[in-house]
Amino acid sequence: MSETPVTVPFVSFRPMERELDADLRGAFARVLDNSWYIGGREDAAFEKAFADYCGVRHCVGCGNGLDALVLILKAMGIGPGDEVIAPSNTFIATVLAISYAGATPVLVEPTLESYNIDPARIEAAVTPRTKAIMAVHLYGQCAPMDEINAIAHAHGLKVIEDAAQAHGATYKGRRAGSLGDAPGFSFYPGKNLGALGDAGCVTTNDDALAERIRALGNYGSDYKYHHVYKGQNSRLDELQAAFLAAKLPHLDAMNAERRRIAARYLAEMHNPAVTLPAELPDCTHVWHIFAVRCADRNALEKHLNARGIGTNKHYPTPIHLQGAYAELGLGRGALPLAEEISATELSLPMFYGMTDAQVQAVIDAVNEFEG
């Protein structure tokens, strides 16, 4: 009798949900019992816990990761007429935040080794209108922050971390969320630390900036019915804060499990047609995404899917070729590295609770591909 083939979804929340079921249900019951749903004790408790985790003084909750970046830019006074340098290889929310603030994104190419922005290319992109560098920690690995901060310091620029994919990642022993002037996090459910809905936050050591961000996310109000800014409604609700607080103590263990899976992939995948990602020496990668590259990416995807292996692409169309950013005037060939990554990248299954059999199935399927 033949064995049943092992299927592997691209992602599954079920193992984590089963393990934390009592904690999550307890968090829900606690919020319901308190009968306070916005700006209460759960929000305050999570903000303190996450600030402590990141090693900073302040955490300000908000509605989602995009809002976190928009609030940072607005609180810094960055807007129309200003430029913000950002990587060409990133999720569109990074650049949308710059647009929503009224500033102009200036896209800089990554390195193929890290997928993150190449600091050697940043200097040439700085102009008199540049006000900040948006450093994205893509796929779970920190950008080269020493070089980025040095360039920013030399030109009087702010450094904003887009840490949406890097909860718990470290750079030279310091956690993402403590490496720039103001980092923004997303707690979208699929993140390494995910809510059970949309949520986000900003972390910072800048007292005045934290105060402005909190006000801007609460209709521009510093206290009830007193509005000092033209703000917006972007707050972390009590229920999501309680869920996040229940999951935070498990984040390091869950990241360690991702690192164990990644270590197996890196050690046991030996297909010359598939380029594996790298963990850089100064970084602790938390493997939000395990991104490989293949010249015939679509054939690899078809091969894996036919064997019950789920995949995804991060991201199939680079920002400068999206219709939303036709205004940048950057046609095909303008940013060749971003275009190469978009054409060749494929994301393999990576989630807490993958069984050894599932990990082995992914490894075997990749090794069997004839590219």
PLM-predicted stretches and their roles:
Residues 161-196, 224-228:
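Conserved active-site segment immediately N-terminal to the catalytic lysine
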Residues 74-163, 170:
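PLP-dependent aminotransferase-like
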Residues 185-186, 200-205, 245:
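Short beta-strand-to-turn element immediately C-terminal to the catalytic PLP-Schiff-base lysine
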Residues 2-3, 14, 26, 41-48, ...:
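PLP-dependent aminotransferase class I/II
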Residues 35-83, 96-101, 107-109, 174:
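Phosphate-binding glycine-rich loop
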Residues 60, 85, 106, 159-160, ...:
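Structural detector of well-ordered beta-strand residues that form the stable sheet scaffold
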